[in-house]
């Protein structure tokens, strides 16, 4: 006898087509079972099929989904989850046209977050991050990548990574930890970026030993770290056993996309300024293009990443929130789906694949997350929607009814039984 049986599922989005990254037409294809049923036993999916195929199955608990839609738990592969403070005080300055460099000189911008993160205790960072994870869960997300990067020194970077490790034990969402010590060049290292990168590299052996990070990331952009610096840094991280990511071509076509493909990065993220050559190289690689349209939207920029061109050329595209206090303060992956549809010209089918299958591969979780398949963890979302196109179409709200994490109900609309986080 099964533990749980979900019946009367109007559309069951299994996302279970070919293994590996989805490209071109595969991105525009959604495996959907009409009148579907999912069986769960010992926190694992044990049955996926139609109501006809499920005849005779029995379970301790039978949940009637009322003809609504069920999908896998969503995957957010790019967030800056652990940080101190917030930066709503900068909104008026931005609207007045005050340049970012001037905001920095006033102690704002990333420096404000760095200072707040340094001053916060680990427990304060954990509690604040729990609050944000709770929201992510309520939007249907069950797997999240979490970066450090608001320390720019060893002590605070360790604190962020240790906070992430604690969150992994205390919150139902699965976390994937990324070391982003090379997020910016601190003032005291101005003009000495190579020395700073060496300092960050010196932290990696102990980080690997303590298993505090799975990925290493770097911000490759004009005025921060060059393409050559980024490649050298990430290749050394790979030699130490880390997988790598790169913040690439967010503003300028610097060559970050090309570098990511060349060194075999798991993902290249942002890519607003990616060149035609960079897109071509990504299409011929296993590097996922993780696009962050919420950031472009919040920064009030006109030019978005060329998502349509990337997909048409064969790039494996994923979507993420880029949740952070400065350029994209939202946990709402559903809003990102809507923006991607409208501004990146992605179809609803492509959007769904980009927040499940491809996003799971962007963080090396393609074998465990992003699909409803027998043998996988029962990470499921019941939606207050009867078809998949409705979710990105009706934007700005959450359509989630219930979230199951490892077969257990982790969120139900109107209830917050998963955490007592405060902010």
Curated annotation (Swiss-Prot):
Record pathway: Amino-acid degradation; L-histidine degradation into L-glutamate; N-formimidoyl-L-glutamate from L-histidine: step 3/3
Superkingdom in the source lineage: Bacteria
InterPro entries the record matches: Amidohydro-rel, HutI, Metal-dep_hydrolase_composite, Metal_Hydrolase
Cofactor annotation: Zn(2+); Fe(3+)
E.C. no: 3.5.2.7
GO molecular-function terms, A-Z: imidazolonepropionase activity; iron ion binding; zinc ion binding
Keyword Transit peptide part of the UniProt annotation: no
NCBIfam families reported for this sequence: hutI
This protein's name: Imidazolonepropionase
Organism for this UniProt entry: Bacillus cereus (strain G9842)
Organism lineage: Bacteria, Bacillati, Bacillota, Bacilli, Bacillales
């Amino acid at each position: 006898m099964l533990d749980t049986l979900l019946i009367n599922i109007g559309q069951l989005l299994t996302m279970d087509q070919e293994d590996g990254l989805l490209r071109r037409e595969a991105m525009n294809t959604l495996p959907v079972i009409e009148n579907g049923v999912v069986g769960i036993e010992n926190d694992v999916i044990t049955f996926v099929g139609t109501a006809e195929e499920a005849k005779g199955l029995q379970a301790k608990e039978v949940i009637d989904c009322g003809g609504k839609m069920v999908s896998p738990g969503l995957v957010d592969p790019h967030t800056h989850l652990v940080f101190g403070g917030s930066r709503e005080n900068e909104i008026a300055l931005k609207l007045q046209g005050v340049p970012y460099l001037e905001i920095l000189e006033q102690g704002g911008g990333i420096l404000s977050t760095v200072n707040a993160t340094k001053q916060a205790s680990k427990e304060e960072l954990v509690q604040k991050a729990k609050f944000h994870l709770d929201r992510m869960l309520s939007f249907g997300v069950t797997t999240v990548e979490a970066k450090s990067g608001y320390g720019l020194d060893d002590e605070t970077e360790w604190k962020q990574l240790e906070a992430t490790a604690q969150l992994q034990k205390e919150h139902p969402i699965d976390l994937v930890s990324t070391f982003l010590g090379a997020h910016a060049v601190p003032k005291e290292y101005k003009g000495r970026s190579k020395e700073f990168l060496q300092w960050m590299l010196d932290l990696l052996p102990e980080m690997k030993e303590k298993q505090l990070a799975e990925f290493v990331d770097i911000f490759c952009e004009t005025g921060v770290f060059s393409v050559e610096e980024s490649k050298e840094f990430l290749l050394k991280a790979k030699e130490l056993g880390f997988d790598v990511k790169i913040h690439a071509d967010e503003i300028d076509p610097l060559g970050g996309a090309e570098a990511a493909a060349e060194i075999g990065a798991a993902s290249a993220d942002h890519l607003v300024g990616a060149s035609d050559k960079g897109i071509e190289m990504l299409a011929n690689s296993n590097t996922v293009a993780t696009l962050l349209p919420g950031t472009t939207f919040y920064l009030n920029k006109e030019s978005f990443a060329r998502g349509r061109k990337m997909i048409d050329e064969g790039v494996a595209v994923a979507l993420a929130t880029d949740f952070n206090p400065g350029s994209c303060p939202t946990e709402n992956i559903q809003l990102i789906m809507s923006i991607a549809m409208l501004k990146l010209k992605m179809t609803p089918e492509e959007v769904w694949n980009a927040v499940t299958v491809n996003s799971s591969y962007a963080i090396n979780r393609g074998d465990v997350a992003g699909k409803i398949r027998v043998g996988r963890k029962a990470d499921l979302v019941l939606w207050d929607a009867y078809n998949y196109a409705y979710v990105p179409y009706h934007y700005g709200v959450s359509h989630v009814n219930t979230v199951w994490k490892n077969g257990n109900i982790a969120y139900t609309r109107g209830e917050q039984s998963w955490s007592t986080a405060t902010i």
